[in-house]
Curated annotation (Swiss-Prot):
Keywords: Aminopeptidase, Cell membrane, Glycoprotein, GPI-anchor, Hydrolase, Lipoprotein, Membrane, Metal-binding, Metalloprotease, Protease, Signal, Zinc. It is found in: Cell membrane. A lipid is attached at G968 (GPI-anchor amidated glycine). This is Membrane alanyl aminopeptidase. Binds 1 zinc ion per subunit. It comes from the Eukaryota. Binds to the B.thuringiensis toxin, CryIA(C). Residues 16-35, 969-990 form a propeptide. Zn(2+) binds at H357, H361, E380. Residues 1-15 form the signal peptide. Its EC number is 3.4.11.-. One of its GO terms (cellular component) is cytoplasm. It comes from Manduca sexta (Tobacco hawkmoth).
């Protein structure tokens, strides 16, 4: 879970709860059997829970048998009803609990009748985590039953369920217990129906030690009593109707560090007592964002339940970025605490971004909840959408409308562009592995991008009207996608919003995007003599250009032209439902056209050679900003991806990208950094050509460097400072000498006591260590150890791997796995990534370290799989691959599943070498010729046939449809080879 290792790590990972699964892992998960046996039967349903917990930390009270340190006792009472007749077994969840007693009763008159079947033992049945309860008589419809159980569990350290953490304040080391229940870990705290569809109300009681602060939970404390054993018992107000995964409680010595002191709209920030005013920014933004969501949805937050308040808490060890527990939002410290002097702009916007995401969940996820995780996008897609566009209304300075494209949409497209990608709605999600895998970039970022596209299709007002209808209709309930589609269709009908698109409904349109994986490449061929523009859609695949699973989408079409440029009107001119479409441009002669204005749709665009030449000419002109910044960003990203797949040669791609020499805007450069980083990785084994490529990149940075400079200036805008942070990190990495000199000098000044502006520290730290000594690293590491600001510690941790000193690298690696708490468990992954990937020379050094420390790494991380995968996928020579393979073979019996991980990583490294061998000539031709203006004369403006470098074997078998399938049909016939060749041949040049 990384925060700032280059731009790619900025893009969309941090707001997920739990941590999203990388798309590469999805391919492995998708091969697993999705076992519906993991789902609870729906024969009974809960109405209300009363839960009492008593946690024990490092001291066990005398006189209580069987207790161990870091454990808890619990009692739960669950009121349930059968949903059908003749139910003899109740099934709910439990995991890692010892059931001490359990009985099922019902009230008859003034007494309770026990119907628990005799002769049964109550255990948490694995792997399903089921607690089965047989009854002596069948349950009767319309009768309420009561399950009462006592149990015992352990406060684990794995950051799941009810777990323990610690921190250091003025008094020393403090223990605490907190929770993370999503997606299925409430069952580790108490027996329950641990699926989102089983909503109920909850009364929570916590019996804490007297010297702890008052317990924090979803609701305010209703009653406090002192028990005979001296403990304090705190009972909270009843929750709204909610799912188990949204419950939370914190037993700690926390204090309120920021408070709005508004009894009508209470909002507080909780944290350890030595963080000062670091909660003020999250409080300020939280209040504004909560009010903005209330206005957006027309549903006031504080009226959702009686006594509802809003609290946010900073957790030292937290597996997720943040969690949307109703009334108690929990965060990693680095993602909620902010120091204006010492936290950089990345964290300023990150705090706002994540607070917005979690607050949006109060409506999308809490008030209305996805019925099951197969439609998680109903929760997370809306929250990701809101965290950008709602935050943009509250604080426009943060630039979220611009940043959504490179940070979310383009990242989602990358993840969505492999054949193993999953659909937003995936009915095969049942088992825990599949559920965890569905917390993915596709679910979050693609979900948000499709919602953004839908808003442009309907208009803002109609879209909001539909969302309000959806929320009102499903409040305190669960939802399926058709509930959303129906509400949006009703709003569209009321506003006549789809009248221009004959036969289009939101239901039919949205299903092509939610039930189908992938997205289209829209290939545009312009006949400049006649003005006819031919559009062809086909599913995009990033490695070959052609998916093995063709499909059709309902594509909202927007476009503009040079003679009358209009990038502001994002209402689609038509919705393309078939394989092809012809549009009359309305003019004749050469002029550029650009489709998908401001990237308002979720699709890529390729053009014929002449049109690409005209676009390139426009981008290199003084009037390039006539083309919207987001469209320029789209062009950069599309060109990189078209070239990667082989649909476009790198010679042509670099010809187009040569315009970056004149570009200085934020979004195009973030797209360029991402694209260049992918290519640089594949040049890493070839020092001479890598140097040439890096020199080309440095040459392209003239305009952006001239605007940004290497130092922060007084009065600079937020977006300028943020862009400088990203651009300088990138340019120092590719060897820009002025950047390196500035970084080294600032690092030296810092060692001598000078202050470095927070927005410069990531690249200054990294550059200073990369070109520094062991003494520099030791000074840096000692400063890291004593640093108390959590997000500054993360910045330093992720720069530490930039050292090229071998002894310093080993010191860093040993610190990660030493168990001495210098690196917290939640930061192990990002720290290892920094150590292995920040310098190519570190890869084999890290491998040598791994081979000598397998046992210690396994004790700390659970296995060597993660670091081994990172190492083996970055090998640069056949000699390195042979060395690693030899070690894998020799240790196959002891490293288990990590063996296959290593073999697959070597295959990735070998594929990188082969890719370079296959494509290097295209780069060399551009290095030789430089930019070429290849627009043909007006006399030959018909799009010329393009050469192709893709052989027919690239394509799937021909499947010729007997009849034309209906748009949106689940049985869309595969495109023929001829159609695909036409699509790809538009711009495949040697």
């Amino acid at each position: 879970f990384t925060i700032f290792l280059g731009v790619a790590l900025l893009q969309g990972v941090l707001t997920l709860s739990p941590i999203p699964v990388p798309e590469e892992e999805w391919a492995e998960f998708s091969r697993m059997l999705r076992d519906p046996s993991y789902r609870l039967p729906t024969t009974t349903r809960p109405r209300h829970y009363a839960v009492t917990l008593t946690p024990y930390f490092d001291v066990v009270p005398a006189g209580v048998s069987g207790l161990t340190t870091f454990s808890f006792d619990g009692e739960v009472t669950i009121y349930i009803s059968p949903t059908q007749a003749n139910v003899n077994e109740i099934v709910l969840h439990c995991n890692d609990l010892t059931i001490q007693s359990l009985r099922v009763t019902y009230v008859s008159g003034n007494s309770e009748v026990d119907i628990t079947a005799t002769g049964q033992t109550f255990t948490c049945e694995m792997p399903y985590s089921f607690l089965r309860i047989r009854t002596s008589t069948p349950l009767v419809m319309n009768q309420e039953y009561i399950i009462r159980s006592t149990f015992r569990g352990n406060l684990q350290t794995n950051m799941r369920g009810f777990y323990r953490s610690w921190y250091v304040d003025r008094t020393g080391k403090r223990w605490m217990a907190t929770t993370q229940f999503q997606p299925g870990h409430a069952r580790q705290a108490f027996p329950c129906y641990d699926e989102p569809g089983f909503k109920a109300t909850f009364d929570i009681t916590m019996n804490r030690e007297a010297d702890f602060s008052p317990t924090i939970s979803n609701m305010p404390i209703r009653a406090t009593t002192t028990l005979t054993n001296g403990r304090i018992s705190e009972t909270f107000f009843t929750t709204p109707l909610t799912s188990t995964y949204l419950l939370a409680f914190i037993v700690s010595h926390y204090q309120v560090i920021s408070n709005n002191n508004n009894a009508a709209r209470p909002f507080r920030i909780y944290a350890r007592n030595n963080v000062g005013s670091q909660g003020d920014w999250s409080l300020e933004m939280g209040e504004k964002l909560l009010l903005a969501m209330e206005n957006y949805t027309a549903i006031p937050y504080y009226t959702m339940a009686q006594n509802l308040d809003m609290k946010q808490a900073a957790i030292p060890d937290f597996s997720a970025g943040a969690m949307e527990n109703w009334g108690l939002l929990t965060y990693r410290e680095a993602l909620i605490l902010y120091d204006p002097l010492n936290s950089n702009h990345h964290y300023r916007q990150r705090v706002a971004n994540i607070v917005s995401h979690e607050i949006a969940h109060m409506w999308f996820g809490n008030l209305v909840t996805c019925a099951w995780w197969d439609n998680l996008w109903l929760n997370e897609g809306f929250a990701r959408f809101s965290q950008y566009y709602l935050t943009a209304t509250v604080d426009p300075e943060l630039g979220y409308e611009i940043r959504f494209i490179p940070e979310q949409l383009q990242v989602a497209m990358f993840s969505d562009s492999v054949d193993s990608a999953h659909a937003l709605t995936d009915t095969s999600v049942n088992d825990p592995v599949a559920v965890s895998a569905h917390f993915s970039t596709i679910t979050y970022a693609r979900g948000a991008a499709i919602l953004r596209m839908t808003q442009h299709l309907l208009s803002y007002d109609t879209f909001v009207k539909g969302l309000r209808q959806y929320l009102r209709a499903r409040q305190f309930d669960v939802a399926e996608p058709y509930h959303l589609f129906s509400a949006l269709d009703a709003a569209a009908a009321e506003d006549n919003a789809l009248a221009a698109y004959r036969g289009i409904t939101i239901d039919a349109y949205f299903r092509t995007w939610s039930e189908k994986a992938g997205h289209p490449l829209l290939s545009v061929t312009v006949d400049h003599e006649s003005g006819r523009m031919t559009l062809v859609q086909a599913r995009w695949e990033r490695n070959t250009g052609v998916s093995r699973f063709p499909g059709l989408w309902h594509i909202p079409i927007t476009w503009t032209r040079a003679g009358a440029p209009d990038f502001e009107n994002l209402k689609p001119s038509q919705v393309m439902t078939g394989q092809s479409l012809v549009i009359d441009r309305g003019t004749r002669g050469q002029e550029w056209v650009i489709f998908n204005k401001q990237v308002s749709g979720f699709y890529r665009v390729n053009y014929d050679n002449t049109t690409w030449g005209l676009i390139t000419r426009a981008l290199r002109s003084a009037n390039r900003t006539v083309i919207h910044e987001l469209s320029r960003s789209q062009i950069v990203d599309d060109v990189f991806q078209l070239a990667r797949s082989g649909v476009m040669s790198y010679q042509r791609a670099l010809n187009i990208l040569s315009y970056l020499r004149f570009e200085d805007a934020y979004a195009p450069w973030l797209s360029a950094i991402s694209g260049f980083n992918w290519v640089i990785r594949r040049f890493a084994h070839d020092a001479a050509n890598l140097q040439t490529l890096q020199n080309q990149i440095i040459g392209l940075s003239e305009a952006v460097v001239a605007r940004l400079g290497f130092t922060e200036v007084s009065g600079g805008t937020y977006m300028t400072d943020l862009q400088r942070l990203h651009v300088m990190q990138f340019l120092c990495n590719v060897g820009h000498q002025q950047c390196i000199d500035a970084g080294r000098q600032n690092f030296l000044n810092w060692r001598n006591g000078s202050f470095i502006p927070a927005n410069m520290r990531p690249w200054v730290y990294c550059t200073g260590l990369r070109y520094g000594s062991a003494e520099d690293f030791n000074y840096f590491w000692n400063r890291y150890i004593v640093e108390d600001l959590s997000n500054e510690k993360v910045v330093m941790l992720e720069a530490a791997g930039c050292t090229r000193d071998q002894a310093s690298l080993e010191k860093f690696l040993n610190a990660i796995v030493s168990g001495n708490d210098d690196v917290r468990p939640q930061d192990h992954s990002s720290a290892l990534s920094s150590a292995i990937t920040s310098n190519d020379v570190n890869t084999m050094r890290a491998f040598d370290w791994l081979t000598k420390n397998v046992d210690q790494i396994t004790r700390t991380l659970g296995s060597i799989t993660s670091p081994l995968n990172t190492i083996t996928s970055r090998l640069l020579t056949e000699a390195q691959m042979t060395q690693v393979q030899t070690w894998l073979d020799a240790n196959r019996n002891t490293i288990g599943a990590a063996y296959n991980t290593g073999v697959n990583g070597i295959a990735t490294s070998r594929a990188n070498l082969q890719w370079s061998a296959n494509r290097m000539s295209e780069f060399l031709r551009f290095f030789e010729t430089g930019f070429v203006d290849d627009v043909p004369s007006e006399a030959t403006t018909v799009a010329p046939p393009a050469e192709t470098t893709v052989t027919p074997s690239t394509f799937p078998p021909t499947v010729a449809p007997a009849t034309t399938p209906a748009p949106g049909s689940g049985n869309i016939a595969a495109l023929s080879v001829v159609s695909l060749l036409v699509t790809l041949a538009i711009n495949m040049v040697a």
